[in-house]
Design a protein with these regions (language model features):
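Short, residue-level hotspots on alpha-helical faces of the histone-fold
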Residues: 20-28
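Hydrophobic beta-strand-centered segment that forms part of the acyl-chain substrate-binding groove
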Residues: 27-63, 67-74, 87-93
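Generic secondary-structure boundary/loop-capping signal
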Residues: 4, 10, 45-47, 105
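Short capping/connector residues at structural and topological boundaries
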Residues: 12, 18-19, 53-55, 94
Length: 134
């Protein structure tokens, strides 16, 4: 739920707080995929966009989907969704690298994307590839 402490001077969700929560939600998804929360390092946020304002008192959730796998990196697509209306209020991508926990040396994760024919997910995958010059 969006509280007064989460608002900007326009009385909408502060973008920094929304991005903070996006990174947390995508970290949880990345940790679930890799099975190793200690072996993940944040690398980058890509194209985080607010499509509609998020109002005080609004209940929101984040939906995270793995959309790109490099050798040592994974990219997660995240939607910020209004639980009341189902509207997607913001979208973005977050990339993490997989590392050896105590040395931070890069670690090959071995994760492979599953096959999909979902048009929206295919679009997310193509967009995520574009961040890396593919």
């Amino acid at each position: 739920m969006i509280k007064m402490d989460d608002l900007n001077h326009h009385k909408n969700l502060y973008a920094g707080r929304g991005i903070e929560w996006m990174v947390e939600a995508s970290f949880i998804a990345a940790a679930a995929e890799t099975g190793d929360r200690h072996g993940l390092l944040f690398k980058n946020c890509h194209k985080f966009e607010f499509n509609k304002s998020v109002e005080p008192g609004e209940i929101i959730s984040y939906c995270s989907t793995l959309v790109r796998c490099g050798r040592t990196s994974i990219t997660i697509h995240v939607d910020l969704i209004s639980e009341e209306t189902g509207e997607i209020k913001a979208t973005g991508y977050t990339t993490f690298v997989t590392v050896v926990a105590n040395t931070h040396d890069k670690r090959v994760h071995g994760i492979v994307l599953d096959e999909t024919d979902n048009r929206e997910e295919l679009e997310w995958r193509a967009e995520a590839d574009s961040f890396f010059g593919r």
